[in-house]
Amino acid sequence: VPSGRALAHPRKGKIGKVLFPHRGTIWGVMGAVVFLFAHPQALLFWPGVSCILGGELLRLWASGYIKTYRGPMEEVEELVTSGPYAYLRNPLYLANGIIGCGVVLLSGILWALPLFLGSFVLLYGSIIRAEEAFLEEKFGAAYREYAASVPRFVPRLLPYPKRKGTFAPKVLWEKESTTLLTLGLVVLLFYLRGFGVLRVLDRLLGL
């Protein structure tokens, strides 16, 4: 975003505001469909696990700086520019994308990867526009300067100099423990789907 240039007008982020509270449900439904038709392969399974672990580590780093990241946008009280936010503006969404790619690898359905990436861009593109409009309205010039200096997804080499925000470990237990348990269960289910008792689904589904 060029320095001094206004970001999206709040009215242009209406779709994103509608999708924002339902993003977890949307990914859950898509994941369930992929699981049913999955054909896990050992060659792809463990790289998929590695992607999920890497994405979750980034989530843990990022979520520790955002005290209300699971709440509505209106609960945001400060513009956080420390930690991973000093390098890119959307580390949580990047982490979700990495995790999503990992789940596709677990499934063994490589043709689902471009479908996932397309859905990711459509969903988070709308959400990010809504968030940017809200943050610009709330924090004004401070956010415009930050957005002009820090990319959305491609990390900058050096951290943003005007860093603000602290890491709160307690947030990880309060907000991220469910994600950790869910991802562990996802890996287990896909393992059983491909190499254990849940292979019976192939016969039930006629695959």
What is the predicted role of each segment?
Residues 1-82, 97-207:
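Membrane-anchoring alpha-helices and their flanking helix-loop junctions
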Residues 83-86, 90-94:
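Glycine-rich acyl-CoA binding loop
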